[in-house]
A protein has these predicted regions:
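The feature marks proteins involved in alpha-glucan
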Residues: 1-28, 56-150, 155-159
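Glycine-rich, histidine-containing beta strand-loop boundary motifs that form or position
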Residues: 31, 43, 79
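Short proline/glycine-enriched turn/loop motifs at strand-loop junctions of beta-rich domains
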Residues: 32-39, 46-48, 69
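Short beta-strand elements bearing conserved aromatic residues within extracellular beta-rich modules
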Residues: 39-41, 75
């Protein structure tokens, strides 16, 4: 990863470096935490007992590889602050997350996902010279069903698009 580009905010594929990356015989985990004293990786693969992550030379990234980790397993980062306190945190670059109230990340093998939007990508308009409107919303807190359960993404699509337009 281009570290200078990351620090300047000019890199848009940090997900290729950060997060949990499945390899043939192991999973490599990386995260960015410049203010952490140390980080331990906890998950199903180590019975939720911490595996200390290695700090990068610049001190801002942490990394470790786990041989018995597999796609579908749950994990979190146990992040220690300078005062010794810690918090268990999901992976901000995780490719899968548990549904709340649970908060663990889920190891996903991106090679197992096949995009099927090639026709749409071919037909979409080139609108780089037109204004762009970005609407950011947290779907879980935007709207719930009357019985206090959450909508599916498909159901929210039908509600949110007309709302934003």
């Amino acid at each position: 990863m281009d570290i200078k580009g990351f620090y300047s905010g000019n890199i848009f594929d940090a997900y290729k470096y950060l997060g949990a990356h499945v390899k043939e015989n192991e999973v490599t985990f990386r995260t960015f935490a410049p203010n952490a004293k140390k980080i331990e990786l906890i998950g199903e693969f180590n019975d939720w007992n911490g595996t200390e992550m290695i700090r990068s030379n610049d001190g801002n990234f942490f990394e470790c590889s786990i041989e018995n980790a597999k796609a579908g397993m749950l994990y979190k980062y146990k992040i220690y602050s300078k005062d010794g306190s810690y918090i268990d945190h999901c992976d901000p670059y995780g490719f899968g997350m548990e549904l709340r109230p649970n908060t663990a990340s889920i190891i996903r093998d991106l090679k197992e996902y096949t995009f099927n939007d090639s026709e749409w990508m071919k037909e979409r308009s080139d609108c780089k010279d037109k204004p762009l409107n970005i609407y950011e919303v947290h779907l879980g807190s935007w709207k719930k069903k009357h019985d206090n359960t959450w909508y599916t993404y498909k159901e929210l699509e039908e509600l949110l698009i007309p709302y934003v337009k």
